[in-house]
């Protein structure tokens, strides 16, 4: 496994309920506040929260020091169509939603999953990424893990604070092992300390491409997930403008081009 790549600490980014609850109060903006679109246009800058350590989605290029990746490219596409420039604010994942609620940035473009729980606190653009949960197993694995229920009595590695952790813990009998970073659970998988790992299908392809460990892709074991741009509630003009920007990028093929560049497939459309 290549050990030099940045720390992909989480699969497709979903916070635990407790973390979400801490940022509910600051999210509610006064009714009379200006729409975010007017604020951003006047400023000429869209402040974008992202982790910056999650390749190939968002990471700092070691050669240039600039933020790069799929999310960063999507952000630049949106900003170009809004007529503003992007300003990236690197934020640790556990604090990223709270930072949005506190106004540290205008949006999050960092693989934030669209869930009913999150919609109670934030608004979202239309989805710009679609993927699904997928297992990683040892190369010589003979057991047939076709669904999560097949892992009852087995040890499953997941990312801390991820939707995959929640999904795994919802299945009685799975011995769920939580890890702060993907490299650790893949090492444990290769050496037999866990029986499988669960991650996002797009991330699985990236991890395997950059790993020399004796592991391989397993079955997809869940529904398709949708990722969108998150922002504070009460900004209908901004939401319409961002959705229009994404629709235009999808229509002219530029969003697909960015996805192909990073993943080799078009992850911007539902399968």
Language model: regions and residue ranges:
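Extracytoplasmic small-molecule ligand-binding "clamshell" domains
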Residues: 33-111, 120, 252
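Alpha-to-beta junction loops
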Residues: 46-47, 83-85, 102-110, 154-155, ...
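Ligand-binding cleft/hinge of the Venus flytrap
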Residues: 58-64, 75-84, 147-148, 161-180, ...
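Short helix-initiation/N-cap motifs at beta->coil->alpha
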Residues: 72, 88-98, 143, 162, ...
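A ligand-binding cleft/hinge motif common to bilobed small-molecule-binding domains
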Residues: 95, 112-121, 167-170, 190, ...
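Periplasmic-binding protein-like
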Residues: 130-137, 201, 205-247, 265-271
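Flexible hinge/capping segments at coil-to-helix
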Residues: 139-155
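Ligand-binding clefts/hinges and TM-proximal coupling segments of bilobed small-molecule sensing domains
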Residues: 163-176, 215-218, 246-271
């Amino acid at each position: 496994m290549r050990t030099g790549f940045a720390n992909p600490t989480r699969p497709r980014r979903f916070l635990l309920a407790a973390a979400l609850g801490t940022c509910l109060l600051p999210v509610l903006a006064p009714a009379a506040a200006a729409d975010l679109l007017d604020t951003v246009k006047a400023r000429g800058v869209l402040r974008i929260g992202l982790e910056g350590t999650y390749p190939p989605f968002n990471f700092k290029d070691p050669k240039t020091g600039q933020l790069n990746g799929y999310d960063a490219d999507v952000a630049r596409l949106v900003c170009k169509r809004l007529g503003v420039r992007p300003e990236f604010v690197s934020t640790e994942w556990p604090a990223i939603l709270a930072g949005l609620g506190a106004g540290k940035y205008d949006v999050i473009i960092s693989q934030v999953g669209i869930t009913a729980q999150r919609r109670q606190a934030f608004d979202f653009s239309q989805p710009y990424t679609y993927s699904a949960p997928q297992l990683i197993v040892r190369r010589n694995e003979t057991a047939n893990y076709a669904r999560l229920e097949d892992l009852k009595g087995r040890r499953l590695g997941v990312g801390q604070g991820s939707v995959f952790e929640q999904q795994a813990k919802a299945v009685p009998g799975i011995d769920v092992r939580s890890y702060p970073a993907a490299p650790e659970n893949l090492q444990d998988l290769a050496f037999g300390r866990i029986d499988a790992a669960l991650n996002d299908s797009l991330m699985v392809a990236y991890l395997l491409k950059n790993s020399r460990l004796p592991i391989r892709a397993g079955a997809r074991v869940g529904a398709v997930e949708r990722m969108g741009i998150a922002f504070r509630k009460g900004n209908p003009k901004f939401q319409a403008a961002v959705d229009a920007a994404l629709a235009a990028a999808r229509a002219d093929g530029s969003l697909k081009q960015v996805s192909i560049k990073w993943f080799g497939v078009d992850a911007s459309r539902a399968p």
